[in-house]
């Protein structure tokens, strides 16, 4: 392990390319200055981290739904837009017989079984994530078979992570939105380095940077890396109003932890 920050150590097995990309991202270099292989790796890492995050959210919802009554699940606040999207997908990919029973409450058990046993639930959810969020999400069979999976997806439909996912995949390669995409890349890349053992973080960092701090742990550790390496940073030019219009999230809150 090599010390690269007061609270950070680098795994010596990490290729130079990983450290090179990390340095360029933390310097806020424009993505157009990156080589093709660097961009491909960054895109792959970011989409993988987003996919992992979505699966964790779905697991959380599935655990929450276990051991509680149907009334609690049915009363959860889920966007009307989500149900409209689900119905639109069903109309495109289901048979007429199923649609005839769709709004008959006495047939709900029959519809649920048919959707799960026919594989329609898996197809519907995969189609939704690819079409709307641009991510090829391979949800584990254990989650897909969970009876309330459609409600679990609905519960996270407007989650901040999915808004970031939609923005990232929609505007990857768009020069006008490049500063915001670069910010997303920087945080997802740093999360990857920590979660996959490329960086080892001292436990002291968690006592120094607590959850109630606005900047968040990633920004704290990124600053530690930059100070230790004597690194200067290019100014980050973000269009805050455009970010809010497209994601419903302010630029300051995009990766905050409050």
Curated annotation (Swiss-Prot):
<dbReference type="Pfam" id="PF03049">
    <property type="entry name" value="Herpes_UL79"/>
</dbReference>
<dbReference type="InterPro" id="IPR004290">
    <property type="entry name" value="Herpes_UL79"/>
</dbReference>
<protein>
    <recommendedName>
        <fullName>Protein U52</fullName>
    </recommendedName>
</protein>
<comment type="similarity">
    <text>Belongs to the herpesviridae UL79 family.</text>
</comment>
């Amino acid at each position: 392990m090599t010390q690269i920050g007061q609270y950070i150590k680098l795994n010596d097995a990490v290729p130079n390319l990983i450290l090179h990309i990390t340095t360029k991202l933390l310097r806020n270099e424009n993505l157009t200055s990156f080589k093709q292989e660097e961009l491909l790796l960054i895109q792959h890492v970011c989409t993988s981290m987003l996919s992992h995050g979505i699966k964790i959210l779905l697991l959380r919802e599935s655990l929450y739904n276990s051991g509680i009554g149907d009334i609690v699940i049915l009363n959860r606040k889920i966007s009307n837009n989500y149900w409209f999207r689900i119905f639109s997908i069903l109309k495109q990919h289901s048979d007429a017989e199923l649609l005839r029973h769709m709004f008959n409450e006495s047939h709900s058990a029959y519809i649920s079984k048919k959707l799960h046993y026919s594989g329609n639930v898996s197809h519907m959810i995969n189609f939704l994530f690819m079409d709307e969020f641009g991510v090829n999400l391979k949800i584990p069979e254990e989650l897909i078979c969970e009876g309330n999976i459609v409600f679990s997806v609905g519960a996270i439909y407007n989650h901040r992570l999915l808004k970031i996912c939609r923005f990232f995949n929609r505007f990857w390669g768009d020069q006008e939105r490049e500063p915001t995409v670069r910010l997303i890349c920087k945080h997802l890349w740093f999360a990857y380095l920590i979660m996959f053992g490329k960086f080892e973080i001292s436990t002291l960092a968690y006592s120094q940077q607590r959850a109630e701090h606005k900047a968040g742990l990633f920004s704290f550790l990124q600053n530690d890396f930059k100070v230790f390496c004597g690194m200067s940073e290019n100014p980050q030019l973000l269009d805050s109003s455009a970010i809010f219009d497209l994601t419903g999230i302010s630029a300051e809150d995009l990766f905050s932890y409050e």
